[in-house]
């Protein structure tokens, strides 16, 4: 349970980094989304690079697919690839509307998504800390019970 929570927090950290990176690439470099995803994937570990490479490849093919469709399809099943749950993935999937927005609106949406991911991460970190205390107390109590039984 605790390890799963730690894995979710790690994945959220990666997602937050991704959206910070996207913010700087789109805001300062004025890069296209396919280029942003390729650059981000080259700098990341875990399940994210696979997803981002697939999105970038499909965007570069320019076969008439809608960005929203590509983004939604590639993030479907991401729970298996990187341990994220529906709550985080639904926030990430909201980025799918980006294909139709200008740079300013993209940056605003990216910032909003990043902030929501940070809120989820902060909540999970507090939960992890609280559960850590509970596990410590339960461990100490079970140790005392065993020692009393043996005495």
Question: What feature does the model see in each segment?
Answer:
Residues 7, 97-140:
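Membrane-interface, cytosolic juxtamembrane amphipathic helix immediately N-terminal to a transmembrane helix
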Residues 73-104:
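Short, non-transmembrane cytosolic segments of multipass membrane proteins
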Residues 140-146:
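Canonical alpha-helical transmembrane segments of integral membrane proteins
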Residues 8-11, 33, 48, 64-67, ...:
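Residue-level recognition of alpha-helical structural elements
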Residues 23, 48, 56, 60-63, ...:
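A structural signal for well-ordered alpha-helices, especially hydrophobic packing surfaces
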Residues 147-151:
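Juxtamembrane boundary at the C-terminal end of a transmembrane helix
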Residues 1-60:
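Juxtamembrane/interface alpha-helical elements of multi-pass membrane proteins
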Residues 58-82:
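Membrane-protein extramembrane domains
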């Amino acid at each position: 349970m605790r390890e799963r929570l730690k894995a979710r927090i790690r994945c959220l950290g990666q997602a937050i980094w991704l959206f910070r990176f996207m913010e700087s690439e789109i805001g300062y470099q004025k890069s296209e989304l396919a280029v942003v995803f390729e650059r981000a994937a080259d700098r990341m570990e875990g399940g994210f690079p696979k997803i981002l490479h697939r999105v970038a490849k499909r965007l570069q093919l320019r076969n008439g697919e809608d960005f929203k469709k590509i983004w939604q399809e590639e993030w479907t099943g991401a729970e298996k690839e990187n341990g994220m749950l529906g709550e985080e993935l639904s926030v990430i999937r909201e980025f799918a509307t980006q294909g139709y927005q200008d740079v300013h609106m993209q940056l605003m949406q990216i910032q909003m998504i990043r902030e929501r991911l940070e809120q989820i991460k902060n909540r999970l970190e507090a939960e992890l800390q609280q559960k850590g205390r509970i596990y410590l107390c339960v461990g100490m109590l079970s140790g005392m019970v065993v020692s009393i039984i043996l005495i």
